[in-house]
């Protein structure tokens, strides 16, 4: 409580309604131009979220766990949490996974801005806590920090908080999400010549030589295929082929899919050749990398948003009203089971999961 009281006093900005409106309009225009400037999003949320935060407060003060949180006002900051100790926890604990996420993406809970425009310390705390718990949301739902993953998490947060800024993010995100994305996945470290002109960015198929970095030369509809890596089980191959052929009419189940985790020396591909109207089994030279191609905007609209809506509705309690600090040394799967948290489906992990 003492820690947040100091934070509240040092961050509170006294503005009238006209001043808040001016800041809100300026921040909204700035968010679209520079979405990575998270403080703009924070200011817009401060000003637009009074009624939503009021409802969250009413919920928490009538909830046993919520009342304790409001009374003690715990924070995910170094004064309250021994972050170095979290690294020493077992690997499947929430605290270890949380630190793993923060370090992978070079983040810290201190980066989350405190609320500025609430006169009430409880309201200010609720919004500040929501921002700090946001990274916990990434961890328990297994979402990375791409635009589409952030938007999916905002869908869950909208259901749990009703904050207007989350709705704005959901509506704007599809226009900011790339139509197409290339992603190189390396078995080992990135080779030193990766950015040099001599690096082999291409593969040779039976029909033409395709520059995989050139959208103009790359005809996506001619290359619906699996990249199959590390597979040595023939039965697995048979099941994989059956899945591929059974789902050809639903390209969402095929495009951009990678199966991995087994041992395969041939690095085989299956493609469908539109010109000859046949399926082709290719044996390519083994490489130390493979190229992952997918459509982030299509994935967001057709898969991530529906999953996020379902996950948000399924959770028995919003994260901000859970005493997360008491769960850091507990098993993350137990946490998910306790609150019916549904993590990202496996088939979306490489695109949107924490890797």
UniProtKB/Swiss-Prot annotation:
Its cofactor is Zn(2+). One of its GO terms (cellular component) is extrinsic component of mitochondrial inner membrane. The keyword Lyase applies. This is Ubiquinone biosynthesis protein COQ4 homolog, mitochondrial. Its main location: mitochondrion. It comes from Plasmodium chabaudi chabaudi. Belongs to the COQ4 family. Its EC number is 4.1.1.130.
């Amino acid at each position: 409580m003492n820690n947040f009281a100091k934070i509240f006093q040092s961050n509170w900005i006294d503005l009238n309604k006209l001043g808040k409106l001016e800041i809100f309009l300026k921040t909204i225009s700035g968010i679209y131009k520079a979405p990575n400037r998270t403080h703009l999003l924070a200011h817009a949320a401060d000003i637009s979220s009074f009624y939503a935060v009021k409802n969250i407060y009413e919920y928490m003060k009538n909830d046993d766990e919520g009342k304790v949180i409001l009374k003690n006002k715990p924070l995910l900051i170094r004064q309250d949490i021994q972050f170095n100790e979290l690294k020493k926890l077992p690997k499947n604990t929430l605290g270890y996974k949380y630190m793993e996420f923060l370090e992978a993406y070079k983040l810290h809970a201190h980066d989350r801005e405190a609320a500025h425009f609430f006169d009430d310390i409880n309201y200010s705390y609720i919004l500040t806590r929501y921002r700090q718990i946001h990274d916990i949301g990434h961890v328990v739902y297994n979402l990375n920090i791409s635009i589409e993953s952030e938007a999916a998490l905002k869908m869950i947060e909208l259901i749990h908080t009703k904050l207007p800024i989350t709705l704005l993010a959901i509506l704007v995100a599809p226009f900011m999400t790339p139509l197409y994305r290339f992603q190189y996945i390396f078995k080992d470290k990135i080779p030193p010549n990766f950015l040099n002109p001599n690096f082999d960015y291409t593969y040779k198929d039976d029909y033409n030589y395709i520059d995989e970095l050139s959208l103009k030369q790359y005809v996506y509809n001619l290359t619906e295929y699996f990249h199959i890596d590390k597979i040595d089980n023939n039965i697995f191959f048979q099941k994989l082929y059956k899945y591929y052929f059974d789902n050809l009419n639903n390209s969402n189940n095929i495009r951009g899919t990678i199966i991995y985790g087994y041992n395969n020396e041939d690095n085989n591909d299956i493609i469908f050749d539109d010109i000859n109207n046949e399926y082709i089994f290719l044996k390519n030279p083994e490489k130390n990398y493979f190229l992952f191609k997918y459509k982030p905007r299509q994935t967001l609209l057709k898969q991530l948003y529906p999953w996020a809506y379902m996950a948000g509705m399924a959770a028995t309690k919003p994260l901000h009203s859970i005493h997360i600090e008491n769960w850091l040394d507990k098993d993350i799967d137990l946490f998910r089971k306790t609150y019916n948290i549904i993590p990202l489906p496996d088939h979306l992990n490489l695109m949107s999961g924490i890797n």
